[in-house]
């Protein structure tokens, strides 16, 4: 299950003007056909490896399909789509829905989140704690790890977490995330942290802007190897 970041799930070319999300209304530019390159790429990646990818739209369903720009965390308009108390409920609803689908193995459902969605994923893992009926694991890309983003600065989760960070992230602090991970591991959680030298925020965005940085390109290629290894490596 995929959790988009603060920009929302749609292409930046259309999302700024989106007030409506619809599959059937031609005036709605934001729909499954206008996902960002990153979300489309990862959805196809999981399909190619035999997994179903579900991408809930936390923002469009609440009239905020346009998403939010950089450094807007304190914007009051984000309160009702926040990553601590609102978006984890979206993840819980998605888990319940996936388990109702006959073609889905309900014991092998995983989380992948980016930035704000990565923070959401960490909060989901904190909320479910030692529960055996929750998500099996989480792949977390460059999350915000400060107190404003996380429910706790020590995450207690029995499910494994893989955290992928860029050393040159210009939006969030990789050092803060490493500190959170270190405390969490000391408390018994299973968190693997990878910091990519020279990589920035959004290092896995396949667009030319991000991939023109060789460090981002190398990070993306490594992340795609690690992602399937982390998930396939879990025992049923």
Predicted segments, located by residue:
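Alpha/beta-hydrolase fold nucleophile elbow
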Residues: 103-115
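Short glycine-enriched nucleophile-adjacent loop
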Residues: 118-130
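A conserved short beta-strand
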Residues: 131-145
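Short beta-strand/loop motif that positions the catalytic acidic residue
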Residues: 157, 163-165, 169
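C-terminal catalytic histidine-bearing segment of alpha/beta-hydrolase fold enzymes
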Residues: 190-236
């Amino acid at each position: 299950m995929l959790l988009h970041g603060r920009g929302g799930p749609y292409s930046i070319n259309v999302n700024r003007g989106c007030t409506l999300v619809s599959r059937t209304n031609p005036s709605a530019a934001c729909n499954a056909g206008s996902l960002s390159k990153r979300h489309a790429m990862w959805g196809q990646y999981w399909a190619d490896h035999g997994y179903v990818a579900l991408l809930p739209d936390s923002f469009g369903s609440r009239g905020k399909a346009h998403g939010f720009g950089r450094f807007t965390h304190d914007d009051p308009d984000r309160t009702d789509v926040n990553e601590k108390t609102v978006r984890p409920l979206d993840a819980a609803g998605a888990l319940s829905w996936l388990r109702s689908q006959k073609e889905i193995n309900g014991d092998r459902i995983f989380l992948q989140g980016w930035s704000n969605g990565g923070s959401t994923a960490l909060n989901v893992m904190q909320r479910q704690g030692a529960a055996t009926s929750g998500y099996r694991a989480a792949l977390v890309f460059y999350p915000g790890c400060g107190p404003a983003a996380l429910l706790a600065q020590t995450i207690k989760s029995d499910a494994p977490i893989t955290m992928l960070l860029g050393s040159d992230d210009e939006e969030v602090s990789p050092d803060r995330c490493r500190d959170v991970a270190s405390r969490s591991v000391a408390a018994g959680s299973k968190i693997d942290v990878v910091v990519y030298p020279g990589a920035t925020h959004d290092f896995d965005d396949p667009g030319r802007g991000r991939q023109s940085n060789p460090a981002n390109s190398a990070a993306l290629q490594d992340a795609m190897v690690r992602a399937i290894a982390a998930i396939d490596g879990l025992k049923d």
